[in-house]
């Protein structure tokens, strides 16, 4: 599972290739889950899908306008795809049932609420970790805790929704993955 930050913003290398696509295909993974996998304007989704299809992947995405699309590329047959309902304008969780031999595996690809820390916030966080006794540590800590608490209040119900979905599915074989955004520096 990868948060590709919009497929590495569609950057090409000196040979004119997209290293992110080369990396994904070279991984030879049976299942690839992407968060922030929307292709930028210079790298069309159709092109990405054609590369992944040539590499033997079934392509599933859910883009219903309720959140950023979630992507799953699987070499296993895909039986169904569903969005797990929870409140968010940018994040989402995608439930995909895959056929593995005679069994059905439930795969949940998550992109949960982030702390939305700015680069400046991340520097403050690193400074607090490096020198918790510094003069700014207390004020910086209060400011960061306020931001982090807000994101945690949103992420908690998202996690509950995923857990409820998994429990109600009754599946014994479950893979839960994705960008859980539970680290302040993520």
Task: Annotate the PLM regions.
Residues 8, 80, 184:
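Short beta->alpha connector loops of Rossmann-like oxidoreductase domains
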């Amino acid at each position: 599972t990868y948060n590709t930050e919009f497929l590495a913003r569609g950057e090409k290398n000196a040979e004119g290739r997209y290293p992110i696509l080369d990396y994904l295909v070279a991984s030879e993974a049976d299942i690839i889950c992407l968060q922030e996998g929307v292709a930028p304007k210079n790298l069309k989704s159709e092109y990405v899908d054609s590369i992944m299809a040539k590499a033997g992947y079934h392509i599933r995405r859910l883009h219903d306008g309720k959140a950023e699309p979630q992507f799953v590329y699987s070499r296993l047959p895909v039986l169904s795809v569903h969005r797990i309902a929870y409140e968010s304008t940018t994040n989402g969780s995608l439930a995909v049932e895959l056929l593995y031999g005679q069994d059905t595996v439930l795969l949940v690809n998550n992109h949960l609420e982030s702390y939305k820390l700015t680069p400046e916030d991340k520097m403050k966080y690193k400074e607090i970790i490096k020198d918790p006794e510094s003069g700014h540590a207390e004020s910086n800590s209060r400011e960061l805790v306020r931001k982090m608490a807000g994101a945690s209040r949103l992420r908690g119900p998202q996690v509950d929704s995923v857990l409820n979905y998994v429990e109600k599915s009754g599946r014994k074989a479950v893979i839960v993955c994705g960008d859980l955004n539970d680290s302040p520096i993520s």
